[in-house]
Amino acid sequence: MLCLVYNSILCKQRRISLKVLQQFRCWNISKTFLSYRTLTALAIETSCDDTSVSVVRTSDSSSHCQNEIICLNTHRTISKYEAYGGIHPTIVIHEHQKNLAKVIQRTISDAARSGITDFDLIAVTRGPGMIGPLAVGLNTAKGLAVGLQKPLLAVHHMQAHALAVQLEKSIDFPYLNILVSGGHTMLVYSNSLLNHEIIVTTSDIAVGDYLDKCAKYLGIPWDNEMPAAALEQFASPEINSTSYSLKPPIPLNTREKVHSASFSFSGLESYACRIIRKTPLNLSEKKFFAYQLQYAAFQHICQKTLLALKRLDLSKVKYLVCSGGVARNELLKKMLNDTLMVLQFEHQPTDIKLVYPSPDICSDNAAMIGYTAIQMFKAGYTSSFDVEPIRKWPINQILTVEGWLTKKNKKV
């Protein structure tokens, strides 16, 4: 049904200029913005290998805002890349092209069974991420927005991770955000929807990339999981008499570098590769080494987080939020919780709470894209139809890229 509507409208309007479409769409946005307290988004996320589509609804009242994930469908293809040791850039595009329409169809059907047959906006990830996969999702979203005459919201992927916790929990700004994934490792002070100050970021590779490579070096089967998740399942803290030498050094832990405002994981990766290639390891030693490789990386993250917390005005910070795919790791959660206990003991009494999204919302997903799009729409922003995917896009520069429009059709 959606395809029929899309084709019909698109055929009628194919001669209409982009300018006319934008003017019509802006009028429709203003009308919707003024009259609706409930907003529903159809959202698409294709920044890496997962093909994810969701319908998200927010309902505002005078006292609170209720958020609801009507449906979320994510097609995972990670098993196809184990033979390549990572995401294959050509195959991943083909998989998105093959699967996206089917996932959209399933999501729309699921939403219809919940009584939702119309959407107020079309949301999609614009970046940062892999250009090919992003383009598949972005072009599909543009077609849906034009065909259904709905506003387009092209969302910042890491902004969505930073806001993901608000989708499920009543958490207000400001809060400190640890964003840990395959492409990013950042400590961010999230002050508002658009104000995200980078406190610490990685100087080389991301922690998720590091963990994925460690799993590859150790030859751990992925079992339809991300390599980092397979590493977590494989690891064991149990030690024997031959394992003491398998404890990697904590990065940037010297007197000269311990206070530096950066993460670094490339040295740990080189250490892991060197030990595994030169040292024969039995199964128990591999399991212990896998645990220690995680521990060293997470201890590094915790040290920098503790340093940042000591420097911040803690009277304004109520939450330490951990988001992104690596935030699913149970060892990381435990170590961050221990870090807050150290802060209480060393620094000052504080009621900062460690919170994180549910596992499915930690990983790449369209629900967080839909929620973020709705918040941007409420703030008066939409996206033009000529927006292009962005590979690198700092979270503290959300509005600096071309393609944002205000309610009066003015470019930002």
Curated annotation (Swiss-Prot):
Residues 1-78 form a transit peptide. Homodimer. CDD domains: ASKHA_NBD_OSGEPL1_QRI7_euk. It is found in: Mitochondrion. It comes from Schizosaccharomyces pombe (strain 972 / ATCC 24843). Keywords: Acyltransferase, Metal-binding, Mitochondrion, Transferase, Transit peptide, tRNA processing. The gene is pgp1. InterPro entries: ATPase_NBD, Gcp-like_dom, KAE1/TsaD, Peptidase_M22_CS, TsaD. This is tRNA N6-adenosine threonylcarbamoyltransferase, mitochondrial. Required for the formation of a threonylcarbamoyl group on adenosine at position 37 (t(6)A37) in mitochondrial tRNAs that read codons beginning with adenine. Probably involved in the transfer of the threonylcarbamoyl moiety of threonylcarbamoyl-AMP (TC-AMP) to the N6 group of A37. Involved in mitochondrial genome maintenance. GO terms for cellular component: mitochondrion. Its main location: mitochondrion. It comes from the Eukaryota. It catalyses: L-threonylcarbamoyladenylate + adenosine(37) in tRNA = N(6)-L-threonylcarbamoyladenosine(37) in tRNA + AMP + H(+). GO terms for molecular function: N(6)-L-threonylcarbamoyladenine synthase activity; zinc ion binding. Coiled coil: none annotated. It is an enzyme of class 2 (transferase).
